[in-house]
C-alpha cells in the first residue's frame, strides 16, 4: 500500500502547505520535493486559508512559535478540516514553556489532526501534562528503550484512540501507532542528536491519499 501511495505522490505532485519551524524550513521544503510533492511555506493569517484551499495537505509545526503564527495555524487547520485534508501536528517543545503547551493543547481542541508527531516528552505533555521536555528534546527520563517499549507502545495506542489520530513518537526507537496496532522502527543513530531538525522532516510530506 505504501509503495502505491508513494508512487501516486510522485505522479500527481500535490502541493503541501507548511506552517513550520524557521530553523529547518529549507530542509523541510527539500524533503517535500524529494518525496515528489511540492512545498509552499505560508504563515500570514491573511492568506493561509487561501493557500490551504489549493493544497493537498497541511503541516503545522510550533518550533518557532509566535502570537502571529498561532492565529495562522488555527485558521489553516480549521480550513483544512472543512476541506477534508490531512493535517499533521508537530508540537515542538510542548512542555518547555506555558505558551507552547497551551498552544499545542488549543490546536488539539480546535483542529482535527490526522497525525501527531513528537518526541516522547512532547507527546506525554499533550496526553497528560507529565512530560519533562528538555527544550525541544526529550528528557532522558522519558526516552523509549527496549526495557520500557511495551508501556510506550500502550501509551501511544491509548493517545491515538483518544485523539483519533495516528501518533508517531520519534527517538532512538520510533513508534507509529493508531488505536489498534503499532509499529516500532529501530533505525535511530546517536549522530542524529548532533544535528537539528531530522525529526521535523518526517512531518513535512503530508498529502491526502492521492488515489481519491
Which residues does each PLM region occupy?
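Glycine-rich phosphate/adenosyl-contacting loop at the front of the ribokinase-like
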Residues: 1-41
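Single conserved hydrophobic/aromatic residue that forms the stacking wall/gate
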Residues: 207-212
Amino acid at each position: 500500500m505504501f509503495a502505491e501511495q508513494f508512487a501516486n505522490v510522485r505522479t500527481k505532485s500535490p502541493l503541501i502547505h507548511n506552517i513550520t519551524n524557521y530553523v529547518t524550513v529549507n530542509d523541510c521544503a527539500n524533503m517535500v520535493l524529494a518525496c515528489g510533492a511540492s512545498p509552499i511555506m505560508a504563515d500570514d493569517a491573511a492568506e493561509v486559508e487561501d493557500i490551504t484551499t489549493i493544497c493537498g495537505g497541511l503541516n503545522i509545526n510550533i518550533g518557532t512559535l509566535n502570537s502571529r503564527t498561532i492565529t495562522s495555524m488555527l485558521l489553516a487547520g480549521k480550513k483544512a478540516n472543512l476541506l477534508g485534508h490531512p493535517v499533521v501536528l508537530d508540537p515542538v517543545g510542548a512542555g518547555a514553556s506555558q505558551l507552547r503547551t497551551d498552544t499545542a493543547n488549543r490546536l488539539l481542541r480546535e483542529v482535527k489532526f490526522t497525525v501527531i508527531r513528537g518526541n516522547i516528552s512532547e507527546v506525554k505533555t499533550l496526553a497528560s501534562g507529565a512530560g519533562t521536555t528538555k527544550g525541544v528534546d526529550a528528557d532522558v527520563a522519558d526516552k523509549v528503550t527496549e526495557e520500557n517499549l511495551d508501556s510506550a507502545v500502550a501509551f501511544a495506542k491509548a493517545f491515538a484512540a483518544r485523539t483519533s489520530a495516528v501518533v508517531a513518537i520519534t527517538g532512538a526507537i520510533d513508534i507509529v501507532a493508531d488505536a489498534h496496532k503499532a509499529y516500532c522502527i529501530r533505525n535511530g543513530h546517536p549522530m542524529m542528536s548532533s544535528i537539528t531538525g531530522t525529526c521535523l522532516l518526517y512531518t513535512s510530506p503530508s498529502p491526502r491519499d492521492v488515489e481519491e
